């Protein structure tokens, strides 16, 4: 074969290759090699073609021959690395890419292939370094900037990843992957509004990308834009009906909307579609919560058992399981799993860092301080400060670490040495241990039968009590009431009571209803068809949270409230309290009992079915009549 003919056949093969006719191109290269078996260009191109045809072992054979004939042929080494990568021979592939780079330091493709392989090997730091070298050669390579962003995201360098995606987008405004990945990084930073914008830009270029609709739905759900989130999940499912994650996301939003039956059906579909045990365990755990809310307790507990079998170490799944177990009174089993909330940062403020002190695990202490960190809502700070009083009684030197607004109130917890809102004031203390307040019952092995009985454990200020006694007077049967929770979660919505339900109490002769409500809900008072006394604009406005509420409660005959901080405050003060509970309450109130292990003076009134506040208040009215007859 003449060199001219070989060149023409090679060019024919290249033209076919570029058009996508890879099999025909391979035939041309093979034809050349029959007559010129040492034609390095034909060997390289045949190896490349075989690689594209998934004939990787043959590709390696021809590319090795090329590199033996031309040891410094950088392109041949690069192609060989690609074929070896496809065969799973990663170390040999990296060595081939390195040889290509050593022979041609400006061969950008070799850097990119090397970096992509490092990403597949989960070595993102080395991948970033390699992408940087590629981009120093070709700074306008938009895909390189995008891939570099993925590597940075893998390293949790999210801001740097976003900057890299921005470079890619500046070079190629319609690069779908850059917009989508940018959205993922923003979502990981909690910047969900910006994430939705990035997902929208990605979908403008590729509207049928199911995963982007899924991630958009997740961010919208975090923003509580629930109807939009549902629409995104449904769009994802229209494109990919087998997408378990979209069914799961849809179920989570429906649960937030208190549409529990629909949520369970979504979780059912998600479980059926997913074969990954850990993920299925997570789905089972959330289905258990939804079943719980429907009162389908045997099914919920069956889901708990299944979850523990298939996902024995998944933080989200085990935390969800713990909430079901706690509600059912299985506290010993639940407490270790409840600790998973810490890894998930449940109720932990943004930017919180654990103290440097050693954690307390239940050991006896001599002169060391034991700092108990309050967590989650105001009611939980109040409730779990009872363990501060309990441990102080056992001889521990207790410091309560709480919200600034609660400091004055919690200073009345008996036996505690200090109440702080900033642990910097303890900087000079060397002998310190610490624990989260809501971890203490688990450390102590607390069960519903062994809750500390040191009630009351809060005290109202005597002067304030006297001032409110004079203001309120002594006439009538005084009932302090609260009705609406301030939060926006599905539980807050279910816990809140329409003010109109208190009409049955207001109709009882001699009863005075006195509002303990602050913030959301007070706007309902003027429209009430019965009298509700208010305590003025300055009520609980200065000097610390609940100081006036506590003093007023000491002058009341009864407090009636849903599950909220008012319920915990009244219980901690030892005041007679009726707590009106939704059909399936938070775990703190347990099931199937009308008393509380936390508060001996508290009675629980439960809905007989979802939304049955009239039934609850009929029973509360009967109890008020009975209570009045005892005191008359």
What is each stretch, according to the model?
Residues 1-632:
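Alpha-helical solenoid repeat scaffolds of the TPR/TPR-like class and their adjacent stem/linker regions
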């Amino acid at each position: 074969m003449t060199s001219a003919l070989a060149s023409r056949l090679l060019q024919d093969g290249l033209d076919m290759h570029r058009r996508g006719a890879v099999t025909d191109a391979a035939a041309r290269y093979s034809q050349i090699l029959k007559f010129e078996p040492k034609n390095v260009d034909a060997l390289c191109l045949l190896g490349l073609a075989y690689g594209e045809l998934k004939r990787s072992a043959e590709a390696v054979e021809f590319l090795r021959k090329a590199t033996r004939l031309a040891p410094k042929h950088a392109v041949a080494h690069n192609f060989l690395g690609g074929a070896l990568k496809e065969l799973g021979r990663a170390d040999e592939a990296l060595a081939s890419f390195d040889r290509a780079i050593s022979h041609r330091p400006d061969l950008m493709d070799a850097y990119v292939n090397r970096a992509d392989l490092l990403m597949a090997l989960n070595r993102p730091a080395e991948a970033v370094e390699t992408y940087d070298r590629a981009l120093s050669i070709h700074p306008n390579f938009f895909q390189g900037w995008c891939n570099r962003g993925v590597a940075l995201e893998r390293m949790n360098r999210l801001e740097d990843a976003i900057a890299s995606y921005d470079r890619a987008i500046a070079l190629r405004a319609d690069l779908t992957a850059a917009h989508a990945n940018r959205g993922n990084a923003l979502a990981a930073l909690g910047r969900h509004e910006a994430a939705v914008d990035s997902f929208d830009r990605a979908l403008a270029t590729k509207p049928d990308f199911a995963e982007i609709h899924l991630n958009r739905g997740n961010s919208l759900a975090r923003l509580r834009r629930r109807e939009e989130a549902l629409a995104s999940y449904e769009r994802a499912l229209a494109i990919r009906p087998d997408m378990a994650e979209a069914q799961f996301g849809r179920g989570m939003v429906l649960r937030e909307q208190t549409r529990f039956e629909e949520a369970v059906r979504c979780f059912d579909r998600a479980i059926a579609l997913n074969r990954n045990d850990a993920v299925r365990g997570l789905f089972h755990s959330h289905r258990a919560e939804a079943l719980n809310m429907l009162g389908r307790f045997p099914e919920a507990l069956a889901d708990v058992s299944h979850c523990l079998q298939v996902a024995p170490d998944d933080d989200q799944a085990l935390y969800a399981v713990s909430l079901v177990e706690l509600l059912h009174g299985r506290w010993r089993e639940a407490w270790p799993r409840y600790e998973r909330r810490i890894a998930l940062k449940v109720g932990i403020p943004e930017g919180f860092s654990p103290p440097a002190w050693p954690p307390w695990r239940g050991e006896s202490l001599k002169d060391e301080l034991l700092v108990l960190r309050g967590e989650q809502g105001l009611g939980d700070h109040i409730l779990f400060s009872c363990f501060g009083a309990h441990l102080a009684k056992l001889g521990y030197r207790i410091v309560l670490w709480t919200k600034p607004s609660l400091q004055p109130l919690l200073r009345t917890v008996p036996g505690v040495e200090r109440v702080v809102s900033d642990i910097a004031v303890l900087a000079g203390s060397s002998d310190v241990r610490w624990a989260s307040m809501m971890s203490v019952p688990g450390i102590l092995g607390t069960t519903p039968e062994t809750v500390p009985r040191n009630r009351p454990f809060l005290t109202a200020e005597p002067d304030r009590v006297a001032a409110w006694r004079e203001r309120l007077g002594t006439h009538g049967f005084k009932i302090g009431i609260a009705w609406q929770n301030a939060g926006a979660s599905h539980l807050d919505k279910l816990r809140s009571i329409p003010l109109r339900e208190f009409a049955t109490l207001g109709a009882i002769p001699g009863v005075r209803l006195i509002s303990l409500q602050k913030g959301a809900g007070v706007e309902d008072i003027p429209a009430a068809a019965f009298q509700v006394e208010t305590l003025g604009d300055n009520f609980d406005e200065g000097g610390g949270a609940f100081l006036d509420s506590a003093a007023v409660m000491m002058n009341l005959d009864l407090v009636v409230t849903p599950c909220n901080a008012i319920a915990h405050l009244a219980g901690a003060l030892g005041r007679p309290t009726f707590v009106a509970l939704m059909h399936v309450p938070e775990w703190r109130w347990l099931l199937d009992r009308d008393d509380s292990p936390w508060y001996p003076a508290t009675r629980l009134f439960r809905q007989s079915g979802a939304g049955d506040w009239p039934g609850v208040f009929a029973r509360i009215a009967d109890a008020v009549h009975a209570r009045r007859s005892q005191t008359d």
